[in-house]
Amino acid sequence: MADPAECNIKVMCRFRPLNESEVNRGDKYVAKFQGEDTVMIASKPYAFDRVFQSSTSQEQVYNDCAKKIVKDVLEGYNGTIFAYGQTSSGKTHTMEGKLHDPEGMGIIPRIVQDIFNYIYSMDENLEFHIKVSYFEIYLDKIRDLLDVSKTNLSVHEDKNRVPYVKGCTERFVCSPDEVMDTIDEGKSNRHVAVTNMNEHSSRSHSIFLINVKQENTQTEQKLSGKLYLVDLAGSEKVSKTGAEGAVLDEAKNINKSLSALGNVISALAEGSTYVPYRDSKMTRILQDSLGGNCRTTIVICCSPSSYNESETKSTLLFGQRAKTIKNTVCVNVELTAEQWKKKYEKEKEKNKTLRNTIQWLENELNRWRNGETVPIDEQFDKEKANLEAFTADKDIAITSDKPAAAVGMAGSFTDAERRKCEEELAKLYKQLDDKDEEINQQSQLVEKLKTQMLDQEELLASTRRDQDNMQAELNRLQAENDASKEEVKEVLQALEELAVNYDQKSQEVEDKTKEYELLSDELNQKSATLASIDAELQKLKEMTNHQKKRAAEMMASLLKDLAEIGIAVGNNDVKQPEGTGMIDEEFTVARLYISKMKSEVKTMVKRCKQLESTQTESNKKMEENEKELAACQLRISQHEAKIKSLTEYLQNVEQKKRQLEESVDSLGEELVQLRAQEKVHEMEKEHLNKVQTANEVKQAVEQQIQSHRETHQKQISSLRDEVEAKEKLITDLQDQNQKMVLEQERLRVEHERLKATDQEKSRKLHELTVMQDRREQARQDLKGLEETVAKELQTLHNLRKLFVQDLATRVKKSAEVDSDDTGGSAAQKQKISFLENNLEQLTKVHKQLVRDNADLRCELPKLEKRLRATAERVKALESALKEAKENASRDRKRYQQEVDRIKEAVRSKNMARRGHSAQIAKPIRPGQHPAASPTHPGTVRGGGSFVQNNQPVGLRGGGGKQS
């Protein structure tokens, strides 16, 4: 076990509300609260760790009383929570509550759930073995609630002198559901009874024990913790509870065991050397919880009623006494071989220090006995003694080394380096002393030595008597000191290894710190992502609520419209007949309405088919017109392209014509000039003898030029004629194109007009068809109504005839029998008057039916008109409803997809987060066949579990899948 530490028992006080009987009795609420830790009863304050008022919820009580103990139990400490108080003060409600109600459950079901949740969040290298027991102390006998055949179990002590119930059933569990099933099973076997103060009074003390063992698969460290959850029976006054017979015997035993508990609390509070644990089996079982190795929380439950004021004060005094008790708690650790070795070495070092202290004190004592005065600087000093012991051990270790090693050390280390190493070793020794938590023990040793110095004379006398024994003991210690020289070498080597390991561990710590920082950054990122997803989910919830509200409003409006239709059809226009014909007439009206609806549906189907055929024909006509229009547009575009090409060609021809005319003019002029020059040259060659013919040549040249001009003029006129012809052709083509455009526009207008005419005719045809169908339907409905009315009238007429015949027959028989009595008896007269009244009523009914028939015929057109309006309204509502359903379906599908996406994201995050959580391994017990292979026992991840063949199956936290 680890080093112990002291802690006080925590005491919580809870007041229940006034119950119904106390309210009816007119009791006063005597408790007054001051802050969260003090309550006033009759002007006297009582202070506790926490005081809960009557309005405190179960969850708040659990958070303040029990939530911290879960962590302590899983870290290897023992824990106890028990409720104390008088009967009907709310102890069972505090400890158990409503086991399966999330708000009303008490400490036990909440702590069970928290244990598993905490395990899932722990290191994945941990394996857990969890087993539970449930028993009660009834009539001072221990009775197993999970096996009712075990009715008188005994209390024993283990090797550590810790009490336990021998033979009690222990069940291995691996999920909260299994624990709750065990609690339900045990609770069904517990003793309860009805008293004047409580309808479900516990007649026994119940103890639910959770034993948790954990093992680190890497370091092989094993921890164990026990959690006692105790529901005590309440103290009783027979005058108030009205106990009799067996209930009275139970009350005696309950009060006796609670009195023993009070004696134990008083003895512990007063610091008595004797504590009467064995006076009761309950105090024997709770011995470790009261003053032992356990973190204990007591919940004292009180009644605020003035009727129970004395019992409340007694309970508060009990809590105040219990609050002063101190427990010494330590971690329950099973040490490994390596840990035992380290502990052994540690104890050897302590033993060596104590021996040096004894030797120092003996030397000082001998000097005092010899009459010497020991100076203050030579008297015993703990720090000086430790330093000299360390130096002596070092000298012994150095002198005991081999010569070769000494030579090597002398050769390799100088005095300065040796001193430095010695200082370093001294620092390491000091650190080891600090880490081994020897401060407390050294202080205890100092206190003991001070006490010894105060009683020095008595100590001197005792040492004189035991001098011989001490001399022998000194000889033995000297021999042990010689033997421990070798151990000093081992210690030095261990220190060197420890220094190396320390460096390695420091490096590992740095690496782990960096890894932790990276994981922290990643966790912050994941948290931010989760926050954004939560915000998005909130938006989706708001959108969903808006859509739901909108759908609800639409449905409300639809229901309102349908209600108006029902009122218009069923209540106002149809008159309720009188007398016995009401049911028949309602049946007739309903049948008529159903037949109308059937015929209306048939008419609608026919009309839809006709509209479909008409629409098909219109579509065909529209397609033909569109094709014709497309052909016209194609021809127009072709003509436009042709006109454009001809215009371009005409422009090119005109340009070429101008160029040719210019070139011809220039060439003609050049030719004339050349010919004139040639003739002039020829004439010059003939010299002067031909001067007289110059005029003739000149005339000839002028004539030739004139002929060329005429030829050019003719060519120009012919080209101009050709240009005029081309322009005329262009004008004709433009006129033709304009006509085609106008024709196209006319065709388009004609097409639109035909289309509109077709639509108008279709609409009129539809209206005429609807009118014809409605008239036909009204005719058929009227015919059916007339037939129905005729049948009803015929039936009434036949009944009237039969009734008249029967009446005549009876009157005739009565006249024959009573022919002598002309006046007749009073009974016969009454009978005749009754029949006459019936006949008169039938006649009135017949007339009323005739009038109703006439009214119905008059109201038939109105009803048909209203029915048509109703049908149109129903169609509009159906279309709106269909559209709303489609929109709602789309929104629901989109919302479902978004929810699935968010669930998948959250599930993946949970899987990633649980991937490094703790494990609850399946315990292996002798005599059982494993559920899986012998080398790999089956496990269940993520809290899932199953029980097969009554074998305990455990958990590995952080998963969700069975191996």
Curated annotation (Swiss-Prot):
UniProt GO BP: anterograde axonal protein transport; cellular response to type II interferon; centrosome localization; cytoplasm organization; lysosome localization; microtubule-based process; mitochondrial transport; mitochondrion transport along microtubule
Knocked-out gene: effects: Mice are embryonic lethal. They show perinuclear clustering of mitochondria and impaired lysosomal dispersion.
Chief place where the protein resides: cytoplasm
Residue location of crosslink Glycyl lysine isopeptide (Lys-Gly) (interchain with G-Cter in SUMO2): 213
Domain of life: Eukaryota
Keywords, in A-Z order: Acetylation, ATP-binding, Coiled coil, Cytoplasm, Cytoskeleton, Isopeptide bond, Lysosome, Membrane, Methylation, Microtubule, Motor protein, Nucleotide-binding, Phosphoprotein, Ubl conjugation
A Pfam cross-reference name: Kinesin
Residue numbers spanned by region Globular: 915-963
One Gene Ontology molecular-function label: microtubule binding
Region named Disordered: 908-963
Positions that bind ATP: 85-92
Sequence positions bearing N-acetylalanine: 2
Protein topology in the membrane: Peripheral membrane protein
Modified residues (Phosphoserine): 933, 945
Domain Kinesin motor: 8-325
Record PTM Omega-N-methylarginine, positions in chain: 956
Assembly notes: Oligomer composed of two heavy chains and two light chains. Interacts with GRIP1 and PPP1R42. Interacts with SYBU. Interacts with JAKMIP1. Interacts with PLEKHM2. Interacts with ECPAS. Interacts with ZFYVE27. Found in a complex with OGT, RHOT1, RHOT2 and TRAK1. Interacts with APP (via cytoplasmic domain).
Family according to the record: Belongs to the TRAFAC class myosin-kinesin ATPase superfamily. Kinesin family. Kinesin subfamily.
Annotated domain remarks: Composed of three structural domains: a large globular N-terminal domain which is responsible for the motor activity of kinesin (it hydrolyzes ATP and binds microtubule), a central alpha-helical coiled coil domain that mediates the heavy chain dimerization; and a small globular C-terminal domain which interacts with other proteins (such as the kinesin light chains), vesicles and membranous organelles.
Protein known as: Kinesin-1 heavy chain
Organism: Mus musculus
